[in-house]
Amino acid sequence: MDGTLTLAAHNFDDIRQALQIDAGTPILEAIAAMPPSRADATRRHLHAIEMEIAHQSKPQPDAATTLASLQQRGFKLGILTRNAEDIAAATLSAAGLSQFFTKEEVIGRDSCAPKPDPEGIFQLLSHWQADATQSAMVGDYLFDLDAGRNANVTTVHFSPEGDFLWPEKTDVTIRSLSELTDQLG
């Protein structure tokens, strides 16, 4: 969602520094490894930081028109995010994209193991009674592509800059969300 449907707004280095997490360490995994008392306080701090960013979210160019086009063509749309679900809802609302997703179609770290674990994709596939071979995971980061690979769905790497850093984990590359309507048939 962040960096895919919405313009990238997270400075993860700054967030790690605010949370006193070592540079380059995945944030959720670092919190999971902390002693419980520190982990709880760090989760609350992370939530506050993420919520502030969520309220400032802006959509990617063509996000709304692409989602509307895909829905009109019968595609099922879902969100799998490493954010908490209330943060995802705030992000979608601020970006003007809430209307494209039901609550059940927005899955965050409070409902499943975080990406790259494929559990959230499996939940969406089950909800839709869909087959992995006719599904895709669209994302801008390695965790998105790994989750898609781990679930055996098509992986779509979105990078407006054209920096496709993980070709071995990518089935389709796009630089604009509007390309999805052509790429997904």
List each model region and its residues.
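Active-site neighborhood of HAD-like aspartate-dependent phosphohydrolases
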Residues: 1-38
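Residue-level detector of anion-binding/catalytic polar loops
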Residues: 2, 76, 154
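Metal-dependent phosphoesterase signature
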Residues: 32-68, 73-75
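Short beta->alpha linker loops
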Residues: 58-62, 83, 140
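Substrate-recognition element of Asp-dependent hydrolases with the DxDx(T/V) motif
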Residues: 63-95
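Asp-based, Mg2+/Mn2+-dependent phosphohydrolase catalytic module
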Residues: 85, 91-185
